[in-house]
């Protein structure tokens, strides 16, 4: 497994190492610790690949083709080259993806889920059941400030939603959290300026636990996936809302209802305007809100939730690479 330098990925790698050793008696190492030509190395797994890697990737050249495996993590708007240029995918003998379009087109590709931030046990603890409806604020959004020129991106749309609710909600009704806000994220913003959100409340510390603990204090969450056009892309954005007992106003990919019951979330596409969306949530009765939470509780205690777990993700990778449980 080639090294990546981000702290979240390091934590993910440590969990993957422990899980593989416990369930498959397989050791997982970063590339600098092994010789890919050795018979002891059964596979070299890349998490995403793009033209940026290809320019200077001396690692892949040393890996026998039959050992090369690729996990396609990001959607088209973040890593377009892996989708539009098959040349990069053809460098690998095994490919894993959640993208249903690729899976239907290439029978050799292997299906995986988009892993969530915690295991089902954490989601099912229901720690926030004691927070009453009357104690909650109206609306929250938690996301990173991003920019993309790709048409599949929802960044422009969700930023428009944030600006609308900042301007039209009553004071204290809407709060924005996340990284990168109130600073430029594109050349045009650096050149012409950018909008400063007065509703911005900063970053949330404590990773996953801090995020859901903060969201638990709100009735609703604006929940826009980074990409809403690729079937199969359902990230932790919606399941984190469920853990926080915060009803998501969800803008996601086609076919979401095949994985998550429609009774658990509000479809952002059903509204003709942001004003219609605001009117819908501000006029919702406590009883109707409780119906959403009841549906969420049913889903959270169903076997379907296991599909979103990191354990399911690890198992799909292990078995797709040919490893067997001991």
Regions found by a protein language model. Name each.
Residues 1-53, 58-72, 76, 83-145, ...:
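Pol beta-like nucleotidyltransferase catalytic core
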């Amino acid at each position: 497994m080639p090294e990546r330098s981000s702290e979240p990925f390091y934590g993910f790698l440590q969990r993957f190492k422990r899980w593989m050793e416990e369930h498959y008696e397989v050791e997982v190492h970063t590339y600098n610790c092994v010789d890919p030509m050795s018979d002891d190395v059964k596979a070299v797994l890349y998490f995403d690949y793009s033209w940026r890697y290809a320019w200077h990737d001396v690692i892949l050249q040393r890996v026998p083709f039959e050992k090369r495996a690729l996990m396609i993590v990001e959607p088209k708007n973040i890593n377009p080259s892996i989708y539009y240029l098959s040349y990069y995918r053809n460098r690998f003998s095994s490919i894993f993806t959640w993208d249903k379009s690729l899976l239907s087109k290439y029978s050799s590709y292997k299906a995986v889920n988009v892993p969530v931030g915690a295991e089902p046990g954490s989601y099912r603890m229901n720690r926030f059941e004691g927070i009453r409806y009357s104690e909650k604020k109206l609306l929250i959004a938690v996301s990173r400030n991003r920019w993309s020129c790709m048409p599949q991106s929802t960044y422009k749309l969700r930023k428009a939603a944030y600006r609308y609710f900042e301007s039209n909600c009553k004071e204290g009704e809407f709060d924005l959290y996340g990284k990168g806000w109130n600073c430029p994220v594109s050349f045009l913003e650096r050149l012409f300026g950018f909008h400063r959100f007065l509703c911005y409340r900063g970053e949330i510390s404590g990773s996953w636990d801090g995020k859901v603990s903060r969201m638990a204090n709100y009735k609703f969450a604006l929940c826009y996936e980074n990409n809403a056009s690729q079937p199969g892309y359902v990230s932790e954005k919606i399941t984190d809302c469920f853990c926080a007992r915060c009803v998501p106003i969800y803008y996601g990919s086609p076919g979401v209802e095949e994985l998550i019951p429609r009774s658990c979330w509000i479809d952002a596409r059903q509204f003709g305007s942001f004003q219609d969306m605001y009117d819908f949530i501000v006029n919702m009765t406590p009883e109707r809100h409780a119906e959403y939470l009841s549906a969420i509780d049913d889903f959270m205690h169903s076997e379907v939730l296991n599909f979103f777990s990191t354990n399911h993700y690890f198992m799909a990778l292990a078995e797709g690479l040919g490893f067997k449980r001991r």
